[in-house]
């Protein structure tokens, strides 16, 4: 008879609290068509809590506020330049994100000093539902709307001493709405509002780029593996 005994490897679990600061760019029906060009003119700030439950995997919870804008006159497309519409919007976002390190990050071993990482998750966003009044090119605020979104991206992080980490990341937020720029508003008064325009089959994207600084703490436990 062969008795199989599970082998459990237990290590200290570290947690982090931190702040992300950077900029955004928007991809949709109004403004530039550049895919990745975050700008500090549309800033983004996010508080986060992270639980590193292994040397490669972490769960990140976020609460952030970001601004976006689109200006047709800055676009390289002639039709958008001629149309000359513009908007600005404020985005509140709450996210749960799974982060995967390329290299092992063992906080008890200073030789584990840096790693690239990938991440994906689920977000819930609050934004302003906009519309364009008749004969006007600047979007007006109508009401607040909510939607889900999928954050995904890449980054790199490095340790600063024993307790601090500095990171840089690029995040793409795919939203389940096409209303961030006012191109498909929720109509209240169709007499005073311009009709919808653009591609209704393509939802809006927001690109984030910036730096994070976090503080690590805690000595909980996690199970690394079973045999």
PLM region descriptions:
Residues 11-14, 55-56, 104-115, 160-163, ...:
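Short loop/turn motifs that connect adjacent beta-strands in outer-membrane beta-barrel proteins
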Residues 12-52, 210-220:
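Short glycine/proline- and aromatic-enriched beta-strand/turn motifs that initiate or cap beta-hairpins
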Residues 13, 39-43, 90-94, 114, ...:
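Residues that define the transmembrane beta-barrel architecture of outer-membrane proteins
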Residues 19, 23, 47-51, 96-100, ...:
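Residues on the lipid-exposed face of transmembrane beta-strands in outer-membrane beta-barrel proteins
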Residues 29-35, 79-88, 137-142, 196-199:
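Extracellular loop and loop/strand-boundary signature of outer-membrane beta-barrel proteins
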Residues 29-34, 72-78, 109-112, 129-137, ...:
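Outer-membrane beta-barrel translocator domains and adjoining extracellular loop/strand segments
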Residues 55-132, 217:
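Gram-negative (and chloroplast) outer-membrane scaffold detector with strong preference
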Residues 161-227:
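Predominantly the C-terminal beta-signal and adjacent terminal strand-loop region
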């Amino acid at each position: 008879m062969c008795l199989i005994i599970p082998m459990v490897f237990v290590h200290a679990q570290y947690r982090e609290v931190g702040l992300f600061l950077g900029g955004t760019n928007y991809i949709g029906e109004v403004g530039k068509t550049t895919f990745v060009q975050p700008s500090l003119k549309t800033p983004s700030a996010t508080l986060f809590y992270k639980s590193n439950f292994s040397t490669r995997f972490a769960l990140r919870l976020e609460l952030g506020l970001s601004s976006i804008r689109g200006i047709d006159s800055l676009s390289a497309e002639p039709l958008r330049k001629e149309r000359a519409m513009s908007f600005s919007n404020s985005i509140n976002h709450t996210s749960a994100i799974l982060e995967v390190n390329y290299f092992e990050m063992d906080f008890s071993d200073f030789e584990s000093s840096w790693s690239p990482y990938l991440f994906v998750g689920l977000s819930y966003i609050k934004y302003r539902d906009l519309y364009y009044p008749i004969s006007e090119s600047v979007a007006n605020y109508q009401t607040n709307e909510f939607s889900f979104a999928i954050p995904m991206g890449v980054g790199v992080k490095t340790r600063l001493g024993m307790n601090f980490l500095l990171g840089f990341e690029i995040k793409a937020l795919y939203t389940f709405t096409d209303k961030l720029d006012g191109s498909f508003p929720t109509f209240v008064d169709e007499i005073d509002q311009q009709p919808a325009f653009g591609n209704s089959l393509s939802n809006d994207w927001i690109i984030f780029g910036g730096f994070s600084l976090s503080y690590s703490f805690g000595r909980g436990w996690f199970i690394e593996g079973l045999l």
